[in-house]
């Protein structure tokens, strides 16, 4: 197999997005558009990948890191001009170069591989990825000769009446013989309505020089969708969402209502897990097998063990063990590690806490900056008082501890193994192992007080 290279065009302004965020960084199913493209082309066995950047170059470089080399298009003078910016990296290379836009997040490695294979089998100098659509307005048209070979590509604004009637369109993805590509770029003129250097003109140049120009027509037009505004962004989101949901269902995940379930492109979900409506799974989340998630649950960048149930709750940047029960209406905040067989009940908030195996906080509690041992019971209304207005402090609760209802543990404080804290206590000092700590005012009953008070008011 000959050397393979790719150029991703990601320098456009994206003015139609009407956004401060650089266009190719707008997310589709939780991942920037250009990252989707890079992830797919990276499966093609490339020797070099060059991303052409312009506006927001630093942000794109930060997003992609060292998986790509970069070329700067300081002034946007057209797609041919953009590709030419990669000349310093690629111009002297022997092989085949794929050119693709960074705002086409739906393109798949399978389609690009088919394009490359067509290019090789045809012995072509250039091969165009095309599609057939009923309403081609706005797209460049594929003009073929009497033998069915690609003659040229005409941009919509430059097309005559006959050419506008053509329904085979240019998707903006190509592959070229690398040296032929860069030799032709210098011959491209900007004598057109837009005054730009169009990459499709390379097709006509190569054709006029007697080279073979081939085309591969994809049956999956949705893969070629270019995102130029928020409407197209929403269309891409829907298509990608459906693709991800279908993949998970084929792999053994039950999704009760796919139209109301959102799964990020990088999430991994085990078989026999059930996702209820309103479930949103974001980022690099990993969910085990036989889990039940939702309804109305958000999980972001977290790891969920097998046979865990999360109902109407939020989990962010945390790790949950096996057979954990969360919710309804619980909130597990970042940097929490929840053990196996744990119960986190309704209206419980846990933040930056290690919560041991088989421990329970079943209702109305806040556990923050804490280390909770195994087999601990935190009664309703248990609070770790971790913040003094300036600093956060840690609470340590040992194994087998029982915390009574409506208790405050004022950090820094330690409750040692096997200790009990009486309901209603405010603990400000360490509690020894197996001790009972009572820290509340003694109850005083005043006999006949109410009658005396009422009689006094009457008089």
Swiss-Prot record:
The entry describes its oligomerization and partners as: Homotrimer.
Q: Which PROSITE patterns match?
A: HEXAPEP_TRANSFERASES (PS00101)
| Keywords assigned | Acyltransferase, Cell shape, Cell wall biogenesis/degradation, Cytoplasm, Magnesium, Metal-binding, Multifunctional enzyme, Nucleotidyltransferase, Peptidoglycan synthesis, Repeat, Transferase
Q: Name one Pfam family in it.
A: NTP_transferase
Identify the residues that bind Mg(2+): 103, 228
Which residues are listed as membrane-spanning? none
- Species per Swiss-Prot/TrEMBL record: Bacillus cereus (strain AH187)
- Segments of this protein annotated with the region Linker: 231-251
Record SUPFAM superfamilies: Nucleotide-diphospho-sugar transferases (SSF53448), Trimeric LpxA-like enzymes (SSF51161)
Asked whether the UniProt record includes Transferase among its keywords, one would answer yes
Please list the reactions this protein catalyses.
alpha-D-glucosamine 1-phosphate + acetyl-CoA = N-acetyl-alpha-D-glucosamine 1-phosphate + CoA + H(+); N-acetyl-alpha-D-glucosamine 1-phosphate + UTP + H(+) = UDP-N-acetyl-alpha-D-glucosamine + diphosphate
Indicate the family of this protein: In the N-terminal section; belongs to the N-acetylglucosamine-1-phosphate uridyltransferase family.
Q: What is its main location?
A: cytoplasm
- The identity of this protein, by name, is Bifunctional protein GlmU
């Amino acid at each position: 197999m000959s050397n393979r290279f790719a150029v991703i065009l990601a320098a456009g302004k994206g003015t139609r997005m009407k956004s401060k965020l650089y266009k190719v960084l707008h997310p589709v199913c939780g991942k920037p558009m250009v990252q989707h493209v890079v992830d797919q082309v990276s499966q093609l066995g490339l020797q070099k990948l060059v991303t052409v950047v312009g506006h927001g170059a630093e942000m794109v470089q930060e997003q992609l890191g060292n998986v790509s080399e970069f070329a700067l298009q300081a002034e946007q003078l057209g797609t041919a001009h953009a590709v030419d910016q990669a000349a310093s990296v690629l111009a002297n290379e022997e092989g085949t170069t794929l050119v693709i836009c960074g705002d086409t997040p739906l393109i798949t490695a399978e389609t690009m591989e088919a394009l490359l294979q067509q290019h090789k089998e045809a012995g072509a100098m250039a091969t165009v990825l095309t599609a057939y659509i009923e309403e081609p307005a706005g797209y460049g048209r594929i003009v073929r000769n009497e033998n069915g070979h690609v003659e040229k590509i005409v941009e919509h604004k430059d097309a005559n009446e006959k050419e506008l009637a053509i329904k085979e369109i240019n998707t903006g993805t190509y592959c070229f013989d690398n040296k032929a590509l860069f030799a032709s770029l210098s011959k491209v003129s900007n004598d057109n309505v837009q005054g730009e250097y169009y990459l499709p003109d390379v097709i006509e140049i190569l054709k006029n020089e007697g080279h073979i120009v081939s085309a591969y027509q994809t049956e999956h037009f949705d893969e070629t969708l270019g995102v130029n505004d928020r409407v197209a962004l929403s269309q891409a989101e829907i298509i990608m969402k459906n693709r991800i949901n279908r993949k998970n269902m084929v792999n053994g995940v039950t999704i009760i209502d796919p139209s109301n379930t959102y799964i990020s492109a990088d999430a991994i979900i085990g078989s026999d897990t059930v996702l209820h409506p309103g479930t949103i799974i974001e980022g690099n989340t990993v969910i085990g097998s036989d889990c039940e998630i939702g309804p109305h649950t958000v999980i972001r960048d977290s790891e969920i063990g097998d046979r865990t149930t999360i109902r109407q709750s939020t989990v962010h940047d945390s790790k949950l063990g096996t057979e954990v029960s969360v919710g309804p209406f619980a909130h597990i905040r970042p940097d929490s590690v929840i053990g196996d067989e744990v119960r986190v009940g309704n209206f419980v908030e846990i933040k930056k806490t290690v919560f041991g195996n088989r421990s329970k906080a079943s209702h109305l509690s806040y556990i923050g900056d804490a280390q909770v041992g195994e087999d601990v019971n935190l009664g309703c209304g248990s609070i770790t008082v971790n913040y003094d207005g300036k600093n956060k402090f840690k609470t340590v609760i040992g194994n087998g501890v029982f915390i009574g209802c409506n208790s405050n543990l004022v950090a820094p404080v330690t409750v040692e193994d096997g200790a009990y804290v009486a309901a209603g206590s405010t603990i400000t000092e360490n509690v020894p192992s197996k001790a009972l700590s009572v820290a509340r005012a003694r109850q005083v009953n005043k006999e006949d007080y109410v009658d005396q008070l009422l009689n006094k008011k009457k008089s």
